[in-house]
From Swiss-Prot:
It catalyses: tRNA(Asx) + L-aspartate + ATP = L-aspartyl-tRNA(Asx) + AMP + diphosphate. GO terms for molecular function: aspartate-tRNA ligase activity; aspartate-tRNA(Asn) ligase activity; ATP binding; nucleic acid binding. Signal peptide: none annotated. Coiled coil: none annotated. This is Aspartate--tRNA(Asp/Asn) ligase. The gene is aspS. It comes from Geobacter sulfurreducens (strain ATCC 51573 / DSM 12127 / PCA). Belongs to the class-II aminoacyl-tRNA synthetase family. Type 1 subfamily. It is found in: Cytoplasm. It comes from the Bacteria. One of its GO terms (biological process) is aspartyl-tRNA aminoacylation.
């Protein structure tokens, strides 16, 4: 039998009691974390979201409560009444918030029992993640996950407070919207009333927040769910949360200034970390040149070295041919890594092949000389010039990739991060931000043989590049900006196109006919004709931001009910088949690919 709660009222949360509470009569309720029977006295660690309290059952003082405690097991739900007393000398636990006190029980109620657990609820559990996700209600009782979600809630509160103080209005935008397939696939929702037609779940509130600016609301924000039906990676979810903002009558610097204030407030109030403002900025071109990627981790050096001009006339045919064909040659100096074995270098070679590189040339600096199969192809002057470019010293390992610029930058940029992990160059306790600006407006899609928007079709070109949009699309820069933290893009935004003729031009550049643009975006094109203010905004990825703030290894550890990499919720068994009657009401017939 279990007891009913009756008229008992909780007086305190378990993890909040301190020496200041000694002598108080308290009522606590929670889960039994562990039970210890010391041959008379029974000790229970009682847990709630605030932490643990040590509960003492003394048969001499409360025999009935002691009998109840004898039957208690882990994860039973109990309520106790008792007095807060100091722990005996020598038993104080400095690792617990409540470690100086314990509660001497006078009464106890067993509110509910628990089955045997499929896994322990320790801070670190060595168990398959799928088992944890299947029993997510148990997994979420673990302290690390509870702390993650408590911090997430705090970040949401701080965000709303800061943005409201700065004149933003929280306005909801629709979840049932029009499908405008650009980029990732939409999640589609069939309409029962308008059979054969579908809503789409929003990939972002982009167009609606722009229309709110056209409507004169000046500053908008939303902590909003977004949906993308794409192949999932470890750091992606089909549904995710954005801190979404839009501002009228602003330029890039205005948006960045307000958003830096938000980031600084979040880090200060959530983690007691002071973010140095202003955050450094770097152009896209500089990021690619120095780091190979547009989301560089600037906590460490290991920058890419441009070598094309030095080696284009060399006797090493691989390098010379690549340079002659319009490719580039770049390298990395892995300081002190001449000790690497052939197998370790082979592993690095296989790693860069993942990103399209055909191979990885290497040189070891030993005894003041080059040791490498390629050393014989270079003159003494070329070797001296490369040593100077690399800053090469005794014991260094020089690594080279030669290919098309995108392949070279991608592969070396990823190799840079990999080497930083191997060599322990990353200080995991530091947070380093950088804004990336001046992105290309358009990029050529080789598969579809057309131009594609680097960010999205509503990003404005730089004023000075506007006359090149048609004549030289690849040279046009966008009024776009990303915020990168420790090598992770946590926010992206831009100044938007606010003139209809430029928006129509952008759609044409993306290969949309006037009819297609009207069919997909007609309501935006119409709105742009009615006095649209200059405006811009940004969206921060809440899930990734919380993952970095908490030092979590997986984005699934900062979401209450995440999906697997196959898009499934193992706890609720979604997605699942639906009743045939529901399908008939929607005029839908299901055909499953074999």
């Amino acid at each position: 039998m279990t007891d009913m709660l009756g008229d008992w009222k909780r007086s305190h949360l378990c993890g909040t009691l301190t020496k200041a509470d000694v002598g108080k009569q308290v009522t606590l309720m929670g889960w039994v974390m562990r039970r210890r029977d010391h041959g008379g006295l029974i000790f229970i660690d009682l847990r709630d979201r605030e932490g643990l309290a040590q509960i003492v059952f003394d048969p001499a003082k409360a025999p009935e409560a002691h009998r109840e405690a004898e039957a208690v097991r882990n994860e039973y739900v109990v309520a106790i009444k008792g007095e807060v007393v100091p722990r005996p000398e020598g038993t104080v636990n400095p690792n617990m918030k409540t470690g100086e006190v314990e509660i001497l029980v006078t009464q106890c109620k067993l509110l509910n029992r628990s089955k045997a657990l499929p896994f322990t609820l320790d801070d670190y559990v060595d168990v398959a993640e799928n088992l944890r996700l299947k029993h997510r209600y148990l997994d979420l009782r673990r302290t690390p996950l509870q702390q993650n979600l408590i911090l997430r809630s705090r970040v949401s509160q701080v965000t709303r407070q800061y943005l409201t103080e700065n004149g933003f209005l929280e306005i909801e935008t629709p979840f049932l919207t029009k499908s405008t397939p650009e980029g990732a696939r939409d999640f589609l929702v069939p309409s029962r009333i308008n059979q054969g037609n579908f809503y789409a779940l929003p990939q972002s509130p982009q167009i609606f927040k722009q229309i709110l600016m056209i409507s004169g609301f000046d500053r908008y924000f939303q902590v909003v769910r977004c949906f993308r039906d794409e192949d999932l990676r470890a750091d992606r979810q089909p549904e995710f949360t954005q801190i979404d903002c839009e501002l009228s009558f602003v330029d890039r610097d205005d948006v960045i200034a307000v958003m830096e204030g938000l980031i600084a407030r979040i880090f200060k109030e959530a983690k007691e970390i002071d973010v140095q403002l202003p955050i450094p900025r770097m152009t896209y071109a500089e990021a690619i040149r120095r780091y190979g990627v547009d989301n560089p981790d600037v906590r460490f050096g290991l920058e890419l070295v441009e070598l094309t001009d030095i080696v284009k006339g060399s006797g090493f045919k691989v390098f010379a041919d690549v340079a002659a064909g319009g490719g580039i040659i770049k390298g990395l100096n892995a300081k002190g890594c001449a000790r690497f074995s052939r197998k370790e270098i082979d592993d690095l070679t296989e790693f860069v092949k993942i990103y399209g590189a055909k191979g990885l040339a290497y040189v070891k600096i030993e005894g003041g000389e080059w040791h490498s199969p390629i050393a014989k192809f270079f003159t003494a002057q070329e070797i001296a010039d490369m040593n100077r470019a690399f800053g090469a010293e005794e014991g260094d390992l020089l690594l080279f990739v030669a290919d098309k610029p995108k392949v070279v930058n991608d592969s070396l940029g990823k190799l840079r991060n990999q080497l930083a992990q191997i060599l322990g160059l990353v200080d995991k306790g530091t947070f380093k931000f950088v804004w990336i600006t001046d992105f290309p407006l358009l990029e050529w899609d080789e598969e579809e043989k057309r131009w594609a928007a680097v960010h999205h079709p509503f990003t404005a070109p730089m004023d000075e590049d506007l006359d090149k949009v048609e004549s030289d699309p690849g040279a046009c820069r966008a009024k776009a900006y990303d915020l990168v933290l420790n090598g992770n893009e946590i926010g992206g935004g831009s100044i938007r196109i606010h003139q209809q003729h430029i928006q129509s031009l952008m759609f044409r550049m993306l290969g949309l006919s006037e009819e297609e643009a009207r069919a997909k975006f007609g309501f935006l094109l119409d709105a742009l004709e009615f006095g649209t203010p200059p405006h811009g905004g940004i969206a921060f990825g809440m899930d990734r931001l919380i993952m970095l703030l908490t030092g979590s290894d997986s984005i699934r550890d900062v979401i209450a009910f995440p999906k697997t990499q196959k898009g499934a919720c193992l706890m609720s068994d979604a997605p699942s088949p639906v009743d045939s009657k529901q399908l008939r009401e929607l005029a839908i017939k299901v055909t499953v690919k074999q």
